[in-house]
UniProtKB/Swiss-Prot annotation:
Protein source organism: Pseudomonas putida (strain GB-1)
Domain of life: Bacteria
Pfam families: DUF489
Protein name per the record: High frequency lysogenization protein HflD homolog
GO cellular component, one term: plasma membrane
Keywords: Cell inner membrane, Cell membrane, Cytoplasm, Membrane
Spans traversing the lipid bilayer: none
Length: 208
């Protein structure tokens, strides 16, 4: 697997989280498998490659790939505006987080507790989602930049949905961190757009 493919898998994770946040905000619904994939990515330590972070394949990242393609193609008919806004906000928040060793320490110290909960209850159990959401609230929500989520207030006001959204934002920012560690940079989205698209088209044609 090339470094560019590894980067695109990680960036696909950012956009997948963004798509799921938008879906929950607008409809109150999202696939458990998709949510589980993103929450699981928070708990993977020392993966052998980027795919292992997301469960060993990219089946649950395909919606993220499509949203990323829509952003890179700049086609108004395929552009998913809110997911793009959330994804870019997560990339920005990750850069802020990288300067805050105290918050990184808090995240590192609390993830093992969430890991224990996940082993006991399962990845998509409400306790695991609530703990992941609380970790986002106690760390990333304290930064100057905040992500404003738009949607249907009937769904946004439900505590379980709010926790899912925060947990997914945390997972998306973890994917953004991975993308940057692999050499990803926001300028690529502007100046290497065609190269990224060609690689993404190939990845989306390949069965998971």
């Amino acid at each position: 697997m090339s470094n560019l493919q590894e980067q695109l898998i990680a960036l696909g994770g950012v956009f997948q989280a963004a798509v799921l946040v938008d879906r929950i905000a607008r409809t109150g619904q999202a696939s458990e498998a998709n949510i589980g994939c993103m929450l699981g990515s928070l708990l993977v330590r020392d993966p052998k490659d980027t795919l292992e972070v997301f469960g060993g394949d990219d089946l649950n990242l395909r919606d993220g790939y499509r949203a990323l393609v829509g952003a890179l193609e700049r086609d108004p008919s395929s552009l998913q505006r809110e997911p793009l806004r959330y994804a870019l906000s997560m990339l920005g928040l990750e850069r802020q987080l990288n300067k805050r060793g105290d918050l990184l320490d808090t995240i590192g110290n609390r993830l093992p507790q969430i890991q224990s909960q996940a082993e006991h209850f399962g990845l998509v159990h409400e306790n695991v989602i609530a703990s992941s959401g609380a970790l986002y609230q106690d760390t990333l929500s304290t930064l100057r930049q905040r992500i404003q989520v738009h949607g249907d207030m009937r769904f946004l006001q439900q505590a379980s949905n709010a926790s899912k959204i925060r947990a997914l934002l945390l997972a998306g920012i973890r994917a953004a961190r991975l993308w940057r560690q692999l050499g990803g940079h926001r300028w690529q989205l502007v100046f290497s757009r065609r190269k990224l698209l060609n690689e993404l088209y190939d990845m989306m044609r390949t069965p998971s």
